[in-house]
């Protein structure tokens, strides 16, 4: 019987990644970024968080670590890495960023850019 588990290279090849493209944010829409952290191991996995039920927005939701872009963030990738460090203690230097996915508009008025990276 064939092993149905994906190896890391096979897993990554299923993502259609884009190089970061400079773009102007849409009018009246705040920018946010999330890290899609792929855990490096024989059978790769994704790290997700669960937001506190006491949060004002998105309470109790399962999500990737991330959040709004700050003025101190040079790029969307920098924002995703900063938020991942703040939320789940992933040091930015330990993330191998492999690309970004197209931005998604959230129901709360953010344009969210997923940043895909491999973590130890």
From Swiss-Prot:
It comes from Klebsiella aerogenes (Enterobacter aerogenes). Probably mediates the hydrolysis of some nucleoside diphosphate derivatives. Its cofactor is Mn(2+); Mg(2+). GO terms for molecular function: coenzyme A diphosphatase activity; magnesium ion binding; manganese ion binding. GO terms for biological process: nucleoside diphosphate metabolic process. Its EC number is 3.6.1.-. Keywords: Hydrolase, Magnesium, Manganese, Metal-binding. Mg(2+) binds at residues 83, 87. The keyword Magnesium applies. A motif (Nudix box) lies at residues 67-89. CDD domains: NUDIX_CoAse_Nudt7. Residues 29-120 form the Nudix hydrolase domain. The keyword Metal-binding applies. This is Uncharacterized Nudix hydrolase NudL. Pfam families: NUDIX. Belongs to the Nudix hydrolase family. PCD1 subfamily.
